[in-house]
Regions:
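Active-site adenylate/phosphate-handling loop in enzymes that bind or generate adenylated species
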Residues: 4-12, 190, 225, 249-298
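Flexible inter-domain linker/hinge segments
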Residues: 1, 84-85, 89-161
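Short glycine/threonine-rich loop-to-helix capping motif typified by GTGT followed
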Residues: 173-186, 213-217, 245, 294-297
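A conserved beta-strand->alpha-helix junction
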Residues: 84-86, 115-133, 195, 199-255, ...
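A phosphate-binding catalytic loop at a beta-strand-loop-alpha-helix junction
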Residues: 149, 153-194
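Glycine- and acidic
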Residues: 131-145, 164-173, 202-204, 248-254, ...
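Secondary-structure transition/capping motifs at alpha-helix termini
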Residues: 40-41, 72, 160-167, 188-200, ...
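CN hydrolase (nitrilase-like) catalytic-core segments centered on the catalytic cysteine
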Residues: 2-85
Length: 298
């Protein structure tokens, strides 16, 4: 279809002026086709069908207008009603998704572009934007998604542990969400390998900002999962380091924060060396996107 050529040349919104006549069940096929094409091309797809005034011959047109984005139908008109539908297409998100792929060009040689002017008007947002797009609303779907995420991560870690012949896994537990998830994944990987949870070296490393709540959470979690609990305070070591480099401990700047992160990483690495283990990272994609990491500081 022409839409493929346009998308390959960088078009992120396809407008299809169509005259598709009506037969029984064709509306479902049409919606699947439009939604599927928008997913394949990573684009917004506006399908504008002919209405009831198009022809007096032996065919009928229903004005079945559809707006889709990356596989999702945003709006569709009621057939035979000559309705106007409108919605918003998240072009920036589509562009971001395309940058992760090498299929789509900015423009290929020989492709004709026709410039035009369009007045931009401020309008009210009609489309619902989910503040948590990766979290299903249904409890059943949410549990299935969480189990799937844990299984994917656990299988990846299982393969890595097998490949490196590591005898243990070493993980820093803060009591926060990231390290909690990493520990749960590690436990599942060990279960898949049939390894004792005591070979998981779960280390708490209290620092200047550690609260009783996060510390208690960490200890309770480790004991509940029957991992090997270890505690190493970083306060004395970090104070010595600050003295060596002339850092005032009262100045809570990036050096203050990273000094603690680096000390924790050193401890975990040394324990891993001592036990023939692997350090399990607790960073997440948000950290990666923002350019900083729990691992060894920024």
């Amino acid at each position: 279809p022409p839409s493929i050529r346009h998308a390959l040349n960088g078009a992120n919104v396809i407008v299809n002026l169509s005259a598709s006549d009506e037969t029984t069940g064709k509306d479902i096929y049409r919606e699947e086709l439009v939604g599927g094409q928008s997913a394949r091309l990573l684009c917004g797809y506006i399908y504008a069908s002919a209405g009831d005034g198009e022809s007096t011959q032996d065919v009928v047109y229903s004005a079945h207008n559809i707006i889709a984005e990356n596989g999702r139908i945003l709006k569709k008109a009621k057939r035979f009603a000559n309705e106007t539908v409108y919605s918003e297409i998240d072009v920036l998100r589509l562009n971001a998704e395309r940058r992760r792929m090498t299929t789509f060009e900015t423009r290929m040689d020989g492709y004709t572009e026709i410039p035009f002017a369009l007045k931009i008007e401020e309008t009210e947002l009609t489309r619902y934007i989910d503040p948590m797009p990766f979290v299903p609303g249904s409890k059943t779907d949410r549990e299935r998604r969480c189990d799937e995420i844990l299984s994917i991560q656990a299988m990846g870690l299982k393969k890595r542990l097998e490949h490196t012949h590591c005898k243990s896994a070493v993980i820093g537990i803060s009591g926060g969400l990231d390290s909690t998830l990493a520990l749960l994944v590690t436990v599942r990987a060990f279960d898949l390998l049939g390894m004792d949870h005591k070979n998981i070296k779960a280390v708490t490393m209290p620092g200047f900002g550690t609260t009783d709540r996060t510390y208690d959470n960490a200890v309770s979690l480790i004991k509940c999962l029957n991992a090997d609990f270890m505690e190493v305070s970083i306060r004395d070591a970090v104070n010595i380091h600050f003295r060596d480099i002339g850092q005032d401990p009262k100045v809570h700047d990036v050096t203050y924060e990273n000094g603690q992160a680096r000390e924790r990483t050193q401890i975990l690495m040394d324990i891993a060396n001592k036990t023939g283990g692997m350090v399990i990272g607790t960073g997440d994609l948000s950290e990666l996107a923002l350019g900083w990491a729990t691992y060894n500081g920024d």
